[in-house]
Amino acid sequence: MPKTVITPPGTQTPIAPFSPGTLADGIVYVSGTLAFDKDNNVAFPGDAEAQTRQVLETIKSVIETAGGTMEDVTMNHIFLTDWVHYAPMNKVYAEYFPGDKPARYCIQCGLVKPGFVVEIASVAHIGKT
């Protein structure tokens, strides 16, 4: 099964050794995605709504580059630094998944830099939903 690295046009070089996404057998695996600004610093420090929107736009870009849509997302892995961010994250999340909702889980944990409050990784099945 061949694997294709998915890097949307204009994507910044990741600060760690990973690809924004990979496509294999019609399945897109989107790496854990954080809200970085153009200089690879934390965008919108502490703002769960703004970070969630940027994260989901980045995920959408990866999935669309692979030939899919957000309707193809079947699973989301959500990481929050504090449960206080749960409601603001869900407010934005619902905008991106208005119909049938993907499976997901959400856990509280530390993230790689202070100021990040939301990280999401996704799986999408292109053309199979």
From Swiss-Prot:
Question: What is the scientific name of the source organism?
Answer: Caulobacter vibrioides (strain NA1000 / CB15N)
Extract the InterPro entries matched here.
RutC (IPR019898), RutC-like_sf (IPR035959), YjgF/YER057c/UK114 (IPR006175)
Protein family membership: Belongs to the RutC family.
Official protein name in the record: 3-aminoacrylate deaminase RutC
Task: Give its E.C. classification number.
Answer: 3.5.-.-
Question: What keywords are assigned to this protein?
Answer: Hydrolase
Task: Mention any one GO cellular component term assigned to this protein in its UniProt record.
Answer: cytosol
* Function comment: Involved in pyrimidine catabolism. Catalyzes the deamination of 3-aminoacrylate to malonic semialdehyde, a reaction that can also occur spontaneously. RutC may facilitate the reaction and modulate the metabolic fitness, rather than catalyzing essential functions.
Report the superkingdom from the record: Bacteria
Q: Which GO terms describe its biological process?
A: nitrogen utilization; uracil catabolic process
GO-annotated molecular function: deaminase activity
**Catalytic activity from the UniProt record:** (Z)-3-aminoacrylate + H2O + H(+) = 3-oxopropanoate + NH4(+)
Provide the taxonomic classification.
Bacteria, Pseudomonadati, Pseudomonadota, Alphaproteobacteria, Caulobacterales
